[in-house]
Amino acid sequence: YVIGNSSVTISGNSIAAALSDKNQKVSSPTVYDFIKYIEDACICDKVARYDIRGKKALAFQEKIYVCDPGFYRLKKNRIKSEYGHLMETICYNDLISKGYKVFIGKTLTGEVDFIAERGAEKFYLQVAYLLSDEHIIDREFGAFSEIPDHYPKYVVSRDRTTLTRDGIIHKNLVDFLLSDE
């Protein structure tokens, strides 16, 4: 379940409930123990949610990211429909490999995929498979609208066309992965 839901918000309660629906009784503390074992085995990372306005890490609504996207494929036979989650997982692993501390950003009404910090450096990142219509473009670029600071903000997608707007920088996935950021 954890591997198959990389880049999705999880909780011990939701996993216990999902297993209970399949007649597999397990308690939330047991689920959290197993998540910790999976983390300790370097199969996945649990990423804290960070309240951007309150400037503090939150102890709930974390996301799990698999450390190797190959694991993701083990539990997903419909990977084509999951490109957005896979790209988010790849970007997370890239940020970690470059030495960033990574959080999920929580705004008043939404979420920013990543807050990346390394020393005094900080930036925000949204990941989308394709910016294929105006609704998706507005959603991805609009995720930054409630962030009052002036740290750099990026949208990463597979698109080759540059769609930078309102000071938010758009980057192609490959260009982002090959950059120092």
Locations of regions flagged by a protein language model:
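A broadly conserved detector of short glycine/acidic/proline-rich loop/turn motifs that flank catalytic sites
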Residues: 50, 70-71, 120, 128-129, ...
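Conserved beta3 VAIK motif of the Hanks protein kinase fold
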Residues: 125
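Accessory nucleic acid-recognition modules appended to NTPase machines
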Residues: 1-122
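Charged, structured surface patches that assemble and position nucleic-acid processing machinery
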Residues: 173-181
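Catalytic cores of nucleic-acid endonucleases
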Residues: 105, 129-174
